[in-house]
Amino acid sequence: MRKTESQKIALCGVLGALSVVLLLVGAALQIGTYAAPMLAAFLLIPVLDEYGPKYALLLYATVSILSVLLVPELELAFFYVFVIGYYPVLRQQLARIKSTLLRWVIKFAVFNGATVLVYLLLFALLGSAILDELLADGVGMLAALLAAGNLSFWLCDRAVGALTRYYRLILKKKLKFLH
């Protein structure tokens, strides 16, 4: 079955709405600052696989704008916008690099650079309150948080790969209306 523009827009709209709801729930429960953006990013996988990076990036941009406007927790919204929301698309593009070491160096450089950018933006917008919160338990705790963040990112990368394979091998066959 040929994919019409209406079908593409409908799927993107549904997954975009679900992404925003996940971000809102993460903010409301105040436990999903990092988990909710990762879950929302996973919803790009079907769009990326079915319609390509153009539609996936349009979905990401739409969810990003809506999250900044609607999600009350700025850190959560920024984490989606700058750190993890686009990652499934970036991961697919980086898969073209033959060297595994170079690929991982780029992935971690992008993740850490984007994370630093988020906190610099939060510092610029919220003032020293964010810095005081980060340094409240000392520099050692900040280093431990950065290490935990990198471990979480590595797990997220593994999850994106596993979910992409699961979608292609199992879900795609069950969701015949997408293709």
Model-derived features with residue positions:
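Interfacial aromatic-anchored transmembrane helix boundaries in multi-pass membrane proteins
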Residues: 24-33, 64-93
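Hydrophobic alpha-helical transmembrane segments
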Residues: 9-14, 35, 57-61, 77-78, ...
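Short helix-perturbing small/polar motifs within transmembrane alpha-helices
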Residues: 81-120
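Membrane-interface helix termini and inter-helical loops of multi-pass transporters
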Residues: 124-138
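Hydrophobic transmembrane alpha-helices
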Residues: 2-55
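Mid-bilayer segments of alpha-helical transmembrane spans in multi-pass integral membrane proteins
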Residues: 73, 108-125, 150-154, 158
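Alpha-helical transmembrane segments and their cytosolic interface
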Residues: 4-5, 139-179
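Transmembrane alpha-helical core residues of multi-pass small-molecule transporters
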Residues: 40, 59, 63-67, 83-84, ...
